[in-house]
Regions:
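Bacterial Sec-dependent N-terminal signal peptides
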Residues: 1-25
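Active-site-adjacent substrate/metal-binding segments within catalytic domains
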Residues: 28-143
Length: 143
């Protein structure tokens, strides 16, 4: 008799777990810029989107992200930030001048001459920074 009391409870728990997993798989990434650019409110006290939707800045500080993490580590870090609800990742573009990324590439290869900044086959400093920005954008995060 006790088995019959537990069976409906187990079926209910199984149904709830299956529903939660299915819902998580179909959940889309919220892309905040679908609401337009960020603008300062009329009274100058907060940020909002062009369409009037409020913007809540929940930031994580990954200051040395472009210099210390490779692409796999950066993707993992940004995913962890997304799971925790961070929508802004604050990084330093240049910690020093020149800065060097994890791949040993300098931010200022030839002084301030940016003509040959991205070399083929190399994760250059600015190429790596672009990768981080694109990866964050796919996760609905501002850099």
């Amino acid at each position: 008799m006790r088995k019959f009391k537990i069976l409906p409870l187990l079926l209910l728990l199984l149904t709830m777990a299956t529903s939660a997993v299915a819902q998580k798989k179909t959940q889309k990434t919220y892309i905040p810029w679908d609401n337009g650019k960020l603008v300062v409110s009329e009274e100058g006290r907060y940020l909002k989107h062009e369409n009037g939707a409020p913007f809540f800045w929940l930031g994580e500080t990954g200051w040395l992200l472009p210099e210390r993490l490779n692409r796999d580590e950066a993707e993992y870090y940004l995913e962890q930030c997304k799971r925790r609800g961070y929508n802004v990742i604050q990084v330093q573009t240049l910690n020093n001048v020149p800065s060097m990324n994890i791949y040993g590439q300098y931010s200022m290869i030839d002084g301030y001459n940016f003509k040959n900044i991205n070399q083929k086959g190399v994760y250059g400093y600015w190429d790596h920074m672009d990768y981080i920005i694109r990866t964050a954008a796919k996760k609905g995060q501002y850099i």
